[in-house]
Structure formats: C-alpha cells, structure tokens
Amino acid sequence: MAEVQRYALVTGANKGIGFEICRQLAEKGIIVILTSRNEKRGLEARQKLLKELNVSENRLVFHQLDVTDLASVAAVAVFIKSKFGKLDILVNNAGVSGVEMVGDVSVFNEYIEADFKALQALEAGAKEEPPFKPKANGEMIEKFEGAKDCVVTNYYGPKRLTQALIPLLQLSPSPRIVNVSSSFGSLLLLWNEWAKGVLGDEDRLTEERVDEVVEVFLKDIKEGKLEESQWPPHFAAERVSKAALNAYTKIAAKKYPSFRINAICPGYAKTDITFHAGPLSVAEAAQVPVKLALLPDGGPSGCFFPRDKALALY
C-alpha cells in the first residue's frame, strides 16, 4: 500500500532555522510549503533549496505569508485548500526578538548566555535571577513598537495561523503542530507574579487569560512601567511572548486531542537574530522541530521540550 503523501507548512523559512526545517522535511519525502514575509527572498530561498536538494519543483512550493497580517494568513489557507486539500504539519517558526541594538552587538549574546545561566540557577533552586552587567560596550533597548511586533509575531501570529489552518489539519490522519519557542519562555524568568500565576494555572488556562497577560504587558511597556510592574529587565517581550506561546500550546493540545501539538526550544544557534553567535548550526537547531513534526502517533502533546529532551523522545 502506497504511503499517503504528507504536506508541511513552515513559517519564516527564507533563511536560518526555518530554511533548514524545510530542507530536512523535504528530504523525508514531505511536500513543503516554504513561506516568508518577503516574497522575493522567499522565492530565492525556494530556488536555492530546489537546486541543493536536486528534486522536482513540485516537492517544494512557495507562498508569501506574513503571520501578523490576517489577510495574508487567510490567503495561505485558501492556497493550501485549493492546491493540496489538506495539511499534515504546521511549523510556526517565524519570530523576532523585539529589541534594538546600539553599539557593540556582542552584548546581545552576553545577555543570552547570562539568561541561560540564570535559568539553570533558578531551576536548581535559586530564589531570584542574579543581576547581570554586560562587558561589551553596547546597549540593548526595548521600546513599545518593538515589543508589540515581538508579541504579534511570536504569539498572536502563530495562534491565528493555527486557527486558520485547523480545518485543513483535521483532514490529516496524523496532524502535527510545532511551535518554535524558547527556554526564555520559562515562567521562572517571567518575574511578574500575577502573570506567572495566570500562565501557570493549567486548570483555568484559557486563550482569553493568556491574551490578558500579553495586553497588560504591552500596556505597561507603553506607559514605561516595566520595572514598576516587575516585568523582566531584558528580553521582556521575548520572554512574555514565548511564555504565552507555550501556554497556547497547552490550550490547543487540550482542545484538539487527536493532534500532536508541542512547543520546543531549538537551542542557541547561529542565526541573524543572534548575530551568528551560539554553538549550534542552523541545521543542528532544525533537527528539534523536525523531530517533533514527525512525532509518532500516541506521542506527547501539549508539552514544551528543551532541545536535549526533544532529541531523546524517540
């Protein structure tokens, strides 16, 4: 009996981890819909990948997609329905950091490494995140506009795209949704006790309550009240948006029990966002979302997996 053809959509796929996710899924025989906000870059990425994989053009298609634009989201759903009739795998990979850099950009990676160490300390029982002062002569600035873009791209975007594609995923015998998140979405790094309480209360968790946390955060940063309201001192929008995405992952998994829906941290990789620092290549980072995208039936759902735990699943 012939194997049923599977179709996957990957967001933010014209470069970096998203591009490598497309490559690895295509190598598994899956027809991949490579999407990106910028049409020119997306088409160029498709041609590059087709050449590198040496496969027929119908194995990899491109469609413009801006996850922050409702019309763009609706258009890609119509495209998939008309061309393929269903969707098997959705990888919500597109994301932004929400910060502006001034001076030496290596300060960005100092903060990332400090946050990883802080999370390890908190997981080991530390009462609070240790203070950190970077050595590099640079500054990381978080403004309302960047924070809003971060929240819309990292949380609202994946949520709205997922909701738009649910009817097509329901036509798959083994629907999979992978939300590319971050360990920085850990509630241990969220600081604000009210937000931690809301997002950590799984029995009462709803989309409306998650949205409320996000909107209160945006209101506070707009009014210059981040410190007063006890939000994180840096990567605030990144932490809040990824914590919200992790919470939505649990909600969606509970609502659609036949799906396998999980969030993952791919690890600290050399991408444009990290100014190409980090120990992992984008190919290594992509292994994690691909692993979750190909999760066997009966696998876990509604979970967040750090890189090491995801790789050990099967």
Curated annotation (Swiss-Prot):
GO terms assigned for molecular function: (-)-isopiperitenone reductase activity; NADPH binding
Catalytic activity: (2R,5R)-isopulegone + NADP(+) = (6R)-isopiperitenone + NADPH + H(+)
Keywords from the UniProt entry: Cytoplasm, NADP, Oxidoreductase
InterPro entries the record matches: NAD(P)-bd_dom_sf, SDR_fam
Cross-referenced SUPFAM superfamilies: NAD(P)-binding Rossmann-fold domains
GO CC terms: cytoplasm; membrane
Keyword Transit peptide included in the entry's annotation: no
One BP term from GO: menthol biosynthetic process
UniProt EC number: 1.3.1.82
Localization terms from the record: Cytoplasm
Activity response to pH changes: Optimum pH is 5.5.
Amino acids binding NADP(+): 10-33
Superkingdom in the source lineage: Eukaryota
Pathways involved: Secondary metabolite biosynthesis; terpenoid biosynthesis
List of residues binding substrate: 182
Entry function: Monoterpene synthase that catalyzes the specific reduction of the 1(2)-double bond of (-)-isopiperitenone to produce (+)-cis-isopulegone. Does not catalyze the reverse reaction. Unable to reduce (+)-pulegone, (+)-cis-isopulegone, (-)-menthone or the 1,2-double bond of (-)-carvone. Able to utilize NADH with 20% the efficiency of NADPH.
Protein family (similarity comment): Belongs to the short-chain dehydrogenases/reductases (SDR) family.
Protein's name in the database: (-)-isopiperitenone reductase
Organism: Mentha piperita (Peppermint)
